[in-house]
């Protein structure tokens, strides 16, 4: 029972937001107020505890997800908070994705001036995907142009959320000094002398009473929609609703993802962080609020297995991050969903089907490890000793295997060629790249078979900059880099039906496979690379050879017919075929499928696909014409323009990534440094034939196949 109680008072939460909304500063204040640090670290000084990589401290941004355990007393009860500080920059979106997969709740931070920005929209959608309940925190209330109510409106209109303010600010910009708590109807005013560690509870200032009552009524109305008991009281006599009932209704609505309680503050000025911690304890779920976790049987993917969130169940944990630590080596971060994980124990990896011994366990404080004997149910920890582990692997009891749903990561959109400067660097390069690729599923390393060049690919220029920086600092590798390359893909336009026969006679046993198949673009509602359909009747191709045909097509799709770019969104239907009782084997059918793919794609009007980026430019009115003119030259499509609250203009456009290299510098020149831009991946689209021919000529591809 004590363990269940401990679960009840545990919170696994993340802070997510657009870049520069103040996530790391908020995390630093949480560490300060919970007593984990005795001095506040500032991002702009390069001293933030959560930003522990040198590149993070230099650039003032968060790159990796730092995990920290803190404790907070609320209502005479000690709560354990596992806090993950995630990056806001779009190039590191994988860090957000894998953190949300294992969190129970999240704090969505918004800038009181910028409001809902492109990356805040991206992370909000990621949280929706993983059903993560959120509370909203409008930060930077002390800045010029801060407007809490405008941000609340944007949440409703841009994100389609149901924001429910439980506080309103007292003052704004330089006069911001506290908040009105709409639940207790008291004013909370922060004390500057104590670095914001203490605040005074006062009566609401007379000039705010009317506004506070109006917003309290809106809060109660929102809650009444989610809670039938409260609805009756709200319509009979709202004054009879108690504080405890409001808190219970807020928690219930948040857990059901019907509402998002909204708070405000200024983390940098030490105002609003304690009430945010209280709200985390009050409204966000504990591991016990998710009574079961679902997975599948490794031997039968259609069989669903449920595990209760209990220490008495067999072990079930998910590895969500791999990191290389200079002191302890390969570190695996995981979340325990059921059972317990003692140090020195063996665990079964459902993907590799191997047992691994975890030699040591840690609870993390940023990049420092605190040794632990056991990581309990519902907790987040890190371990060393794994030989073969990847992000998304399920760790379980060998006698009770289970596979949790893994994580999908986006394909890289940009690549650069790298070559070591000296022979000594060459030896270290392979080791460094392999370790970095283990840590980051959106980072890929390939060797060009023709030129022997090593090409590294990632989510953006900043992503690759930091990889090269880490090679230099952590692995002591100096390398030259080529110009950025776009990660093109290939696709086909037309359906093709063909017969492919593979026959080889070498004396003795030969090779034979015969396939009749239809190759065409995948169905519109299909998500993934290969949509494979088996329509073979009467055993003309034995069932044991069908997976080899599928494997052959999957292998072939990694190198398209135009210039060896990968191909996805393909549908292959195996209609018929034949086999030889002696000469046919799995390899014969795999090779036959490889040949069928090549011959079919050449006839199916192949086309080149390029990544299209969603671009948002904030520019002064007088530069708008130049900005739009420049986007038109870059094959951009302007989708809309609107005015920001600060009087600037916001231009929204879709632009091919190939045209966007060096855009930040060009934009600075056009607008005399007064504009900013954010870019996120949108989708892949067909390259116009004239440009496709240029690209294929440079890549020494099959220009003759482009119509």
From Swiss-Prot:
InterPro entries: EFG_II, EFG_III, EFG_III/V, EFG_IV, EFG_V, EFG_V-like, EFTu-like_2, G_TR_CS. GO terms for biological process: ribosome disassembly. One of its GO terms (cellular component) is cytoplasm. GO terms for molecular function: GTP binding; GTPase activity; translation elongation factor activity. Residues 288-308 are annotated as: Disordered. Its main location: cytoplasm. It is found in: Cytoplasm. GTP binds at residues 17-24, 85-89, 139-142. Keywords: Cytoplasm, Elongation factor, GTP-binding, Nucleotide-binding, Protein biosynthesis. Residues 8-288 form the tr-type G domain. Belongs to the TRAFAC class translation factor GTPase superfamily. Classic translation factor GTPase family. EF-G/EF-2 subfamily. Catalyzes the GTP-dependent ribosomal translocation step during translation elongation. During this step, the ribosome changes from the pre-translocational (PRE) to the post-translocational (POST) state as the newly formed A-site-bound peptidyl-tRNA and P-site-bound deacylated tRNA move to the P and E sites, respectively. Catalyzes the coordinated movement of the two tRNA molecules, the mRNA and conformational changes in the ribosome. This is Elongation factor G.
């Amino acid at each position: 029972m004590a363990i269940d109680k401990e679960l009840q008072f545990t919170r696994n939460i993340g802070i997510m937001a657009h870049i520069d909304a103040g996530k790391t500063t908020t995390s630093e204040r949480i560490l300060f107020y919970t007593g984990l640090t005795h001095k506040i670290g500032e991002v702009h000084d390069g001293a933030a505890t959560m930003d522990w990589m040198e590149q993070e401290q230099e650039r003032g941004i968060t790159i990796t997800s730092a995990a920290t355990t803190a404790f907070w007393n609320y209502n005479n009860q000690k709560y354990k908070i596992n806090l993950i500080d995630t990056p806001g920059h779009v190039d590191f979106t994988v860090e957000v994705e894998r953190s949300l997969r294992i969190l129970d709740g999240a704090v969505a931070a918004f800038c009181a001036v910028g409001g809902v920005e492109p990356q805040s929209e991206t992370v909000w959608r990621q949280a929706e995907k993983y059903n993560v309940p959120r509370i909203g925190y409008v930060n930077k209330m002390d800045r010029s142009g801060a407007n809490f109510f405008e941000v609340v409106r944007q949440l409703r209109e841009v994100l389609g959320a149901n924001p429910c303010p439980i506080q309103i600010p007292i003052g704004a910009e330089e006069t911001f000094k506290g908040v009105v708590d709409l639940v207790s109807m008291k004013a909370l005013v922060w004390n500057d002398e104590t670095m914001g560690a203490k605040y005074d509870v006062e009566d609401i200032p007379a000039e705010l009473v009317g506004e506070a009552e109006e917003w309290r009524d809106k809060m109660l109305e929102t809650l009444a929609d989610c809670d039938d008991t409260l609805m009756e009281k709200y319509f009979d006599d709202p004054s009879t609703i108690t504080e405890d009932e409001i808190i219970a209704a807020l928690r219930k609505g948040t857990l059901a993802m019907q509402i998002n309680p909204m708070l405000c503050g200024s983390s940098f000025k030490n105002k609003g962080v304690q009430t945010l911690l209280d709200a985390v304890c009050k409204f966000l779920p504990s591991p016990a609020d998710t009574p079961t976790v679902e997975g599948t049987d490794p031997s039968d993917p259609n069989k669903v297995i449920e595990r209760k969130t209990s220490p008495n169940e067999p072990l079930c944990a998910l590895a969500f991050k791999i990191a290389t630590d200079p002191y302890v080596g390969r570190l695996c971060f995981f979340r325990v969903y059921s059972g317990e994980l003692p140090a020195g124990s063996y665990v079964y990896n459902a993907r590799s089907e191997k047992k691994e011994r975890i030699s040591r366990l840690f609870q993390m404080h940023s990049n420092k490890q605190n040794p632990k004997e056991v990581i309990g149910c519902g907790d987040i920890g890190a371990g060393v000793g794994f030989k073969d582990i990847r992000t998304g692997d399920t760790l379980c009891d060998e006698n009770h295997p289970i596979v949790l749903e893994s994580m999908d990561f986006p394909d890289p959109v940009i690549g650069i060629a790298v070559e070591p400067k000296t022979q000594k660097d060459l030896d270290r390069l392979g080791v460094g790249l392999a370790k970095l690729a283990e840590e980051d599923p959106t980072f890929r390393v390939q060797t060009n078979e023709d030129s022997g060049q090593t090409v590294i690919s990632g989510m953006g220029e900043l992503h690759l900059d930091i990889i090269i920086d880490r090679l230099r600092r952590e692995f002591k590798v100096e390398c030259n880099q080529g110009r950025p390359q776009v990660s093109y893909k290939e696709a086909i336009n037309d359906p093709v039906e063909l017969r492919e026969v593979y026959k080889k006679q070498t004396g003795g046993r030969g090779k034979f496979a015969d396939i009749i198949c239809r190759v065409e673009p995948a169905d519109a509602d299909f998500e993934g690379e290969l949509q494979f359909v088996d329509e073979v009747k009467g055993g003309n191709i034995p069932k044991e050879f069908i997976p080899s045909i599928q494997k052959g097509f999957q292998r072939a799709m990694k190198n398209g017919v135009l210039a060896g770019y990968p191909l996805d969104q393909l549908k292959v239907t195996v209609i018929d075929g034949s086999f030889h009782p002696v000469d046919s084997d799995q390899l014969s059918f795999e090779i036959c499928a490889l040949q069928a793919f090549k011959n079919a794609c050449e006839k199916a009007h192949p086309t080149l696909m390029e990544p299209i980026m969603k671009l948002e430019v904030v520019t002064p009115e007088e530069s708008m014409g130049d900005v739009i003119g420049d986007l038109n030259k870059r094959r951009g499509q302007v989708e809309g323009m609107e005015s920001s609250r600060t009087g600037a203009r916001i231009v929204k456009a879709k632009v091919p990534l190939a045209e966007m290299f060096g855009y930040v510098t060009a934009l600075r020149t056009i607008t005399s440094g007064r504009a900013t831009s954010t870019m996120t991946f949108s989708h892949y689209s067909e390259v116009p034939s004239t440009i496709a021919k240029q690209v294929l000529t440079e890549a020494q591809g099959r220009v003759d196949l482009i119509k």
